[in-house]
A protein has these predicted regions:
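Conserved helicase/translocase motor-coupling segment
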Residues: 14, 29-30
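Inter-lobe coupling/hinge segments of SF2-like helicase ATPases
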Residues: 14-22
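Conserved C-terminal helix/linker of AAA+ ATPases
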Residues: 1-10, 57-59
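C-terminal accessory/connector segments of nucleic-acid motor ATPases
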Residues: 37, 42, 54-58
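C-terminal helical "lid" of AAA+/P-loop NTPase domains
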Residues: 1, 42-46
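Terminal-proximal interaction/regulatory segments of ATP-powered molecular machines
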Residues: 50-56, 65-142, 147, 151
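Conserved small/polar residues in nucleotide/adenosyl-binding loops
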Residues: 163-170
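Amphipathic alpha-helical repeat elements characteristic of tetratricopeptide repeat
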Residues: 21-22, 38, 77
Length: 173
């Protein structure tokens, strides 16, 4: 009789490093990425009820703010950090509202992964050309000897030029 009662309980499934842990966090992340605040709040509540560390969730939300929201709402990073700070000061259950606020904010924010993609591409490019020296025109020339070797030759101080477009003036890197 007692065993049947225990077996009928709806105990949240969770493991700190296994499929349930990553499944809940993935569902939260993808709900936010999909701009669905209701689903995001549901998966947040599921994760918290299952015993997920709120600070792990905040780390994930911070990651979402820079990878998925990015430059479409750059303030989201600061707002997630402010919510994290609020949670640290209040603790649970009051601080849980700060978590929920971050989930809603990120869900409703426009999304851009341009920085994430640009960073990945620049890392590949830097690895491919890791032995290339910087072009001499952008090297510092603190001595006359370095100037004679071409360091800094042809460098144009951007603040002294009229700004015309976000594209480079020429093909020099």
């Amino acid at each position: 009789k007692d065993l049947n009662k225990i077996l009928s309980l709806n105990i949240p499934k969770h493991d700190k490093a296994g499929d349930n842990h990553y499944g809940l966090i993935s569902a939260l992340h993808k709900s936010i990425r999909g701009s669905d605040p209701d689903a995001g709040l549901f998966w947040l509540a599921r994760a918290l009820n299952a015993g997920e560390d709120p600070f792990y969730i905040f780390r994930r939300l911070l990651r979402i703010s820079i990878e998925d929201v990015g430059l479409a709402n750059p303030e989201s990073q600061r707002l997630v950090l402010d919510s994290w700070n609020t949670y640290e000061k209040l603790g649970s259950p009051e601080g849980d509202i700060a978590l929920a606020m971050s989930v809603i904010l990120l869900s409703l924010s426009p999304k851009s992964n341009a920085v994430y993609l640009a960073d990945k591409e620049s890392q590949k490019f830097a690895k491919k050309y890791s032995s290339e020296q910087p072009p001499k025109h952008i090297l510092n020339s603190p001595t006359k000897l370095m100037g004679r070797f071409g360091y800094g030759a042809g460098y144009e101080y951007d603040h002294c030029l009229l700004y015309t477009s976000p594209s480079p003036r020429d093909s020099r890197v």
